[in-house]
Amino acid sequence: MTKSELIERLCAEQTHLSAKEIEDAVKNILEHMASTLEAGERIEIRGFGSFSLHYREPRVGRNPKTGDKVELEGKYVPHFKPGKELRERVNL
């Protein structure tokens, strides 16, 4: 599901809100989550999961086009850990 598909679905379910209000709400939530992670903080949504940053160590990679070795710096990457309720819900 894309962001625009999410907005469309919410518009269909929440007919008392305008499409602009829903779009703004979704964008604000995502922006707030991104800035929270950017600040190094963890996000926990009970029953859904948590978002945090994991450090990826520096390593030697390869350029897929040329096969040459490339030094990759260490960096923080976003990580999502699903909560128990979500894991149980999607485990068909």
Curated annotation (Swiss-Prot):
Gene3D superfamilies named among the record's database cross-references: IHF-like DNA-binding proteins
Q: Which GO terms describe its cellular component?
A: chromosome; cytosol
Q: What PROSITE patterns does this protein map onto?
A: HISTONE_LIKE
Gene Ontology MF annotations = DNA binding; structural constituent of chromatin
Magnesium recorded as keyword: no
**Keyword Transcription carried by entry:** yes
**The organism's place on the tree of life at top rank:** Bacteria
Q: Alphabetically list the UniProt keywords.
A: DNA recombination, DNA-binding, Transcription, Transcription regulation, Translation regulation
Any single GO BP term: DNA recombination
Function comment:
This protein is one of the two subunits of integration host factor, a specific DNA-binding protein that functions in genetic recombination as well as in transcriptional and translational control.
Subunit structure, as described in the record = Heterodimer of an alpha and a beta chain.
Protein family: Belongs to the bacterial histone-like protein family.
- The protein's name is Integration host factor subunit beta
- Natural source organism: Vibrio cholerae serotype O1 (strain ATCC 39315 / El Tor Inaba N16961)
